Amino acid sequence: MDYCKQLSLVSDRLLKDYDVIIDTNTVIKNKKHVGVLPDYAHAAYHAFYGQIKEVNIKWLNFKFEKLPNVCGKINILPAEKVFSDWEGIVWFKGIPETYHLKDFKVLDFFVNEACVGFYNIEGKTEELHYLYFEEEPVPLGINLEGYCQLLSLSYGFFYWQSAIVELITKKKSQESKDFKRYMPKLFSDFSYPQFVEVYNQVRIKKT
């Protein structure tokens, strides 16, 4: 996948929308591969960080300025940050050595209280999980390539990942409701049925 092209489509689309107010719009390309990824990391991470260093996009729409949750945030971290120690944020001192979140790495730190990440364990790095801090991670059934494809449809709408969580768990949330309600009003080219269709196409096939 051409990750630079995929994520630049998001950036370019936002720049063309006169109703969108862009706070941050950064897609930093990598000139060489970052050597901090473990060899066993899924191929998608090696491909991604061979092209892109980090992505930080924040936007809102002036028609909905009074609704703080009607906005977009993407914050895909540099590889050296992703594969660093997340003690004090994801997990804390005093927990058992076997605590599974010690192996959890944050990829898209889109808001202070939640993120999308993965388990840095050989054979388990492919699938991304949604983590609302102090709760258990929810497997999203997609890898980094699928995540970027869905980002290009959702434009990083605030908590857009909750729509996937709803599809998986059948549990409704205000965030998912906002996504389905406001995205068609913000972007005329957005279609929730198409979003679901693409999600089903990029889901990891379980064997």
Q: Language-model features: where?
A:
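Short, surface-exposed beta-strand/loop micro-motifs that present aromatic residues
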Residues: 114-121
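Short glycine-rich, low-complexity/disordered patches
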Residues: 20-30, 62, 157-169, 196
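Generic alpha-helical structural element
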Residues: 3, 133-136, 172
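Compact, glycine/acidic-enriched structural inserts
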Residues: 127-161
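A short, compositionally biased
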Residues: 101, 123-126
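Charge-dense, low-complexity intrinsically disordered regions
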Residues: 167-207
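Alpha-helix initiation and N-capping motif
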Residues: 1, 7, 141-145, 157, ...
